[in-house]
Amino acid sequence: MSAAGTGEGAAAGSATVEGVVVGSLDAGHLDDVEPLWRALIDHLRESDSVVELVPHELSWPRRRAMYEEMLVDGDSFALGAWRDGRLIGYAVMRVMPPDPVWYTGTHFAELTSLSVAPEERGAGIGTVLLDAVEDRLLARGLDQYCIGVDTVNDGARRFYERRGFRDGFHLLHGWIAGRRAVGAPAPGAPPETPETAAHGED
C-alpha cells in the first residue's frame, strides 16, 4: 500500500470494509489497474453494449495514456482500494474548469472510471471508493459530479441511483453510413411512427 497511496483515513460517515485500505493511486502505479480495467470491459462486453467495444490490446494502452494525462494536471485524481496489499478496486475523477452551459460550481467533475475486482463485487468496495471520492471533492469545495453509464449496465445504474443520482443527459450514438444511403434508420434504431415524426426537431 505504501508505494501506491497515502492511505488517508475515511471521513466521518463514510463507509469502511474490514481489511480494505483506500488511498491515493498515482500515475506511477497504473499498471496495477490493468486487470481491473479489463474486468470492467469484459462486464460491458458480456452485457452486449450498444456500441462495439475496442479490443483489450488497444483499449488499455489508450485508457492508460488518458489516466496519465489526467493525473499530471493537478486537479484530477485517482483512488485505489487494497486488500492485503493487492489492488481490488479503483476510481478516477476528472476535475475540469466549469462548464459553459450547465452550472457546476467552480469546477466540472466527472467520474470517468469505477471498477472492482469480480471476486470482490457485492462486498461494498464500490461504496467505500465512491465515499472516499466524495470526501475528497467536498474537501475541495466541490459538491456535485456526473457519471456516464453504458445503457446496458443496469447494475451500475442502480448503484448510482441508490446514491441519489438521476438522469441529467443522454448521449445518443448513431451510424451515418447506411442511414443516409437508403433513408432508413440505423441498425437498432426504433421505428418511426407518425406521432414521433410529428415531434421531431427537423
Model-predicted regions and their roles:
Residues 1-31, 39-42, 181-202:
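Conserved N-terminal entry element of GNAT/NAT acetyltransferase domains
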Residues 81, 122-130:
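Glycine-rich acyl-CoA binding loop
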Residues 117-119, 123, 151-152:
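Active-site acidic-Proline motif in GNAT/NAT acetyltransferases
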